[in-house]
């Protein structure tokens, strides 16, 4: 029997992104990467099916224009492997680990295969611990689990990107951890903007290297479905390497829906019978294979923040519905809140977290969070009355509730480090203890004497008191 690696086969058929390759006396394993030249470019094909005894059906990781029948193809004997390690920070790679930022080759510690088993039960950590982000509204009302999965919901222009940048910045500063950003099937323009914004806001250095905190792996909308279906795994592989070195890693996926969508396209190309709503029959398996690798081990953790596009706002669509099964927390961004000028525009009543339990966060944190939600919910239910009859018709108690709720709303805003360029005010990282104390005292009426404006865009409650004094002095 011939050795597995470096066996040469020939292309027998090309149909769009699907390429059939014939080998003599040797069949590459399923998921093996096989390579060929397409003009000047290296084209990687991933084995998806065995057809008969000598032919494999593969999915191309790049465009197949220019391929011809009879062309030589080499079996690498292993799955797709991507560079990992500190050399990837500040760089943009594609699905096969090639740099696409025109900054020279990626200096890698090692190459790792993108297909791997999820950590075994014995390697996983069972402690429920929260990841402090320094963002008040997140830490108080929908805290992130270390090694958990967070769904980020929001339309265009409500601040998803800025929130992601601030999380990357804060995790690097507070935990010394790195981040990996996987751009899956989104706009190339957004990917380009994000790269330059990271450099402007100091998250990354141009050309990577010392001082960069985030690695970027892109497979954008213009890529064939094979690349979009695998790029999340390439990004995850980079994150797993940092985790195995003992780090707390943040792993961003934008957008997890596109991962499912690409899987559906690949499935159709391979001729599988579709299931509900035309999705692939292996939808839950594909999603599970990705999500189960995102976890906390005895060495470190990968906490994942996944932007989730909901097609036609239908939460029961199989793609988002399958994602929800894996989430520990949801962060919902609301346009109505951003229109008030309150950033981050996180909806305090819609965002949820499995971690918000007295057994995990403690009684004081839990009670404070519930008190804040209670005040805001009461205000929400009174808004119709206020709109029709005005504030004067409310009882004294309700007037007080409304006044406190409006202060709470404003206190949930805070200046971000990465937005200093636009706002001119320095960013604030707020410790969890300060957040809890501030909101508890505010809801209990300790700061009823301060004006609403004092609570807008400040960090801790002490800053609000200072701002209140300053406003009073200016008014006097």
Swiss-Prot record:
It catalyses: ATP + H2O + 4 H(+)(in) = ADP + phosphate + 5 H(+)(out). Keywords: ATP synthesis, ATP-binding, Cell inner membrane, Cell membrane, CF(1), Hydrogen ion transport, Ion transport, Membrane, Nucleotide-binding, Translocase, Transport. Belongs to the ATPase alpha/beta chains family. It is a peripheral membrane protein. It comes from Nitrobacter winogradskyi (strain ATCC 25391 / DSM 10237 / CIP 104748 / NCIMB 11846 / Nb-255). The gene is atpD. This is ATP synthase subunit beta. It comes from the Bacteria. PANTHER family: ATP SYNTHASE, ATP SYNTHASE SUBUNIT BETA, MITOCHONDRIAL. Produces ATP from ADP in the presence of a proton gradient across the membrane. The catalytic sites are hosted primarily by the beta subunits. It is an enzyme of class 7 (translocase).
């Amino acid at each position: 029997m011939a050795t597995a690696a470096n066996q040469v086969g020939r292309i027998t058929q090309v149909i769009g992104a699907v390429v059939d390759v014939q080998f003599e006396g040797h069949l590459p394993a399923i998921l093996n990467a096989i390579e060929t030249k397409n003009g000047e470019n290296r084209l990687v094909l991933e084995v998806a099916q065995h057809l008969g005894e000598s032919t494999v059906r593969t999915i191309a990781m790049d465009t197949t224009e220019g391929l011809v029948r009879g062309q030589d193809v080499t079996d690498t004997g292993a799955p797709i492997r991507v560079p990992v390690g500190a050399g990837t920070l500040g760089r943009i790679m594609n699905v096969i680990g090639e740099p696409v930022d025109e900054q020279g080759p990626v200096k890698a510690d090692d190459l790792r295969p993108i297909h791997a088993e999820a950590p075994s039960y014995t390697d996983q950590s069972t402690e429920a611990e929260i990841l402090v982000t320094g963002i008040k509204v997140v830490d108080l009302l929908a805290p992130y689990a270390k090694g958990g999965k967070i769904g980020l919901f929001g339309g265009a222009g409500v601040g998803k990107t800025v929130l992601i940048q601030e999380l990357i910045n804060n995790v690097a500063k507070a935990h010394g951890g790195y981040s990996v950003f996987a751009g899956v099937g989104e706009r190339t323009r957004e990917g380009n903007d994000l790269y330059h914004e990271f450099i402007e806001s100091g998250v990354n250095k141009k050309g990577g290297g010392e001082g960069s905190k985030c690695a970027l792996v892109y497979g954008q909308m213009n890529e064939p479905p094979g690349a979009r279906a695998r790029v999340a795994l390439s990004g995850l592989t980079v994150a797993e390497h940092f985790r195995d070195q003992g780090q707390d890693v943040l792993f961003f996926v934008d957008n997890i829906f596109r991962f499912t969508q690409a899987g559906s396209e690949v499935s159709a190309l391979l001729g599988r019978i579709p299931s509900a709503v035309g999705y692939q029959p292996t939808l839950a398996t594909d999603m599970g294979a990705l999500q189960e690798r995102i976890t906390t081990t005895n060495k470190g953790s990968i906490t994942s923040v996944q932007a989730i596009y909901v097609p036609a706002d239908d939460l029961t669509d199989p793609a988002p519905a399958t994602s929800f099964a894996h989430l520990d927390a949801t962060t919902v961004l609301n346009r109505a809140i951003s229109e008030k000028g309150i950033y981050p525009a996180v909806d305090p009543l819609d965002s949820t977290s499995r971690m918000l339990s007295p057994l995990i966060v403690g009684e004081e944190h839990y009670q404070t969070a519930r008190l804040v939600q209670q005040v805001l919910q009461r205000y929400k239910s009174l808004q119709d009355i206020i709109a029709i009859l005005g504030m004067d018709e409310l009882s004294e108690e309700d007037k007080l509730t409304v006044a406190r709720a409006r202060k709470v709303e404003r206190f949930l805003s805070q200046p971000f480090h990465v937005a200093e360029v636009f706002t001119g005010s320095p960013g604030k990282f707020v410790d969890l203890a300060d957040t809890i104390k501030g909101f508890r005292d505010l809801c209990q009426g300790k700061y009823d004497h301060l004006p609403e404006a004092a609570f807008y865009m400040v960090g801790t409650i002490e800053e609000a008191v200072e701002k209140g004094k300053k406003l009073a002095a200016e008014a006097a």
